[in-house]
Amino acid sequence: MTSYSIFKYHWMKIAITGHKRGIGKEFARQLADRGHTIVGISRSDGENIRRTAHTASLIEPCDLFINNAISMYAQTELLFEVWHRWQHSDRDHYIWNISTRVCEWTTDRQITGLTMRQSMEYRNQKIALETAHTQLNSQTSKIKMQLIRPGAVKTQSFSSENSVPAYQYVRQVLEQQDHI
């Protein structure tokens, strides 16, 4: 994993997909509290990340893209679209891809609250994201990418006895960025 600190020197314009719920909501809240400008992209606001060209046009003027929302393979398709738009930019850009530790599991393990089929589909979508992340991150570019793989995080949609509250997990991620 490439190490860098992006918050030490300037305020940023940050695009976050899925900013109304869960981890995305916490990133939006905590980064806004630090003074950053948030460009929130979510279905509840009428946006659809499956419209990748349109969504990428909202993200393009930003400094950091937190690629959080999942909608079939649109999360991966959006990563490619944004990366290609940013690859020849004169300034630094950052992409944080939100994946999951579920990718480490064997295929016969079911995610709490999902059917076995839904668990497999979710895992496969995140594996596709991680594969694309690895491929693009190996390219020479001013785009700095980070793969974030949370474990069980307590959100409106998910809770288990071992889950960490979303606010706590996001705070830890942001503190790591401040001290790298």
Locate each region found by the language model:
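Structural signature of the Rossmann-like NAD(P)-dependent dehydrogenase/reductase core
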Residues: T17, I66-N68, Y94-T100, K144-R149
